[in-house]
Regions:
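A non-catalytic alpha/beta surface segment that caps or lines the substrate-entry region
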Residues: 23, 34-96
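Solvent-exposed loop/turn segments at secondary-structure junctions
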Residues: 45-47, 77-79, 94, 108-112, ...
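Acidic/histidine-rich catalytic neighborhood of metal-dependent amide-processing enzymes
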Residues: 124-218, 222, 234, 242, ...
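Positively charged n-region of N-terminal signal peptides that target proteins for export
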Residues: 1-4
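Hydrophobic h-region of N-terminal signal peptides that target proteins for export
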Residues: 10-18
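Active-site-adjacent substrate-binding region
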Residues: 73, 192, 201-297
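Second-shell loop/turn segments in exported
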Residues: 22-26, 41-52, 73-77, 123-134, ...
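Extracytoplasmic/secreted proteins, especially bacterial periplasmic and envelope-associated proteins
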Residues: 31-38, 55-66, 135-142, 176-180, ...
């Protein structure tokens, strides 16, 4: 009897692992890359370009509504700025699904200046944000397609944050949209989450961001274990640094959220050279498969 129980347990665990791999393998890096291209073609997603912001919001909703249980636009104000966070929920009908509710997030705005440009004449120009802005969104939109095809075992929230990249401009801070989201949704307390930021570089390197490591270590260990199994070499065993990003507002209220972000920042970061040619479908696919496996694991 004991032998049969062990055998049955082994089979169940094997099936679970196989399902996780099967679903994550459906992530298509080329589809994700196309999402980056389409966002970039709208132009900089900044307050002074409202048409590009409207087009991007409409685009994201268009690719979420057929799949998500519900989508919600949450407008917010901060000082004299107006922003919109987009929230898509995939409700799972699995038993105890809400006890393991997971948040996946990315910012969808872009930097309105390019202060890292070597050419001083270009520093006042906005960045297109192919990597820093569009790449995280692209991964989430492709994941949404997979979640619709294969209902996940947990309830998922995909949240697209506005006004992340206004930091150090006129005294503003980074991660405004996520701060406002946490402030305005005090009832929302998922068991954990992942932020995706700058995840398409052709030479992608994701070390262990230190706020995440210090305050969400168990979740980070799970992610890196999956990455090791998948031979996702972009996930480095080395420590990065402390980065101000959309995970911090969640960490401050006790929600363990891991920031997956390229570091050191690439040389085109916050310049006009953050363009589509810097992006790799292979990098997008590697990150997307790891996150998908985390969901189905």
């Amino acid at each position: 009897m004991h032998k049969y129980l062990i055998t049955s347990l082994f089979l169940i665990l094997s099936m679970s692992a196989n399902c996780s791999d099967l679903f994550s393998d459906q992530f298509d890096g080329e589809r994700a890359l196309k999402h980056i291209q389409n966002q970039v073609e709208f132009g900089p997603r900044i307050l002074s370009n409202p048409e590009a912001k409207k087009q991007t919001l409409d685009y994201m909703e268009e690719h979420l509504r057929p799949f998500a249980t519900r989508t919600t636009r949450q407008s917010f104000s901060f000082k004299d700025l107006e922003g919109v966070n987009l929230w898509a929920t995939f409700v799972s009908d699995h038993q105890n699904a809400n006890q393991n509710r997971l948040m996946l997030g990315a910012h969808w705005d872009t930097r309105p200046i390019s202060e890292k440009e070597s050419d001083h004449n270009k520093r006042g120009q906005p960045t297109l944000g192919a990597n820093d802005g569009a790449s995280g969104v692209a991964v989430l939109l492709e994941l949404a397609r997979i979640f619709a095809l294969n209902p996940p075992p947990v309830t998922l929230d995909l949240i697209f944050f506005d006004l992340e990249d206004m930091g150090n401009i006129d005294g503003l801070k980074f991660a405004i949209g996520s701060h406002q989201f946490v402030k305005n949704n005090s009832f929302y307390r998922p068991s954990g989450g992942v932020i995706l930021d700058m995840v398409c570089d052709k030479n992608l390197e994701i070390p262990k961001e230190l706020y995440s490591k210090n305050q969400a270590k168990n979740l980070m260990d799970r992610i890196w274990h999956i990455a090791e199994k998948q031979n996702a070499k972009a996930f480095l065993e080395t420590d990065g640094t402390f980065i101000t990003d959309d995970h911090l507002p969640f960490l401050k209220v006790g929600i363990p959220v891991v920031d997956l972000i390229h570091y050191p920042f690439p040389d085109y970061w916050h310049t006009t050279r953050d363009t589509l040619d810097k992006c790799s479908s292979n990098s997008l696919e590697a990150v997307g498969k790891v996150v998908a496996s985390l969901v189905y694991d």
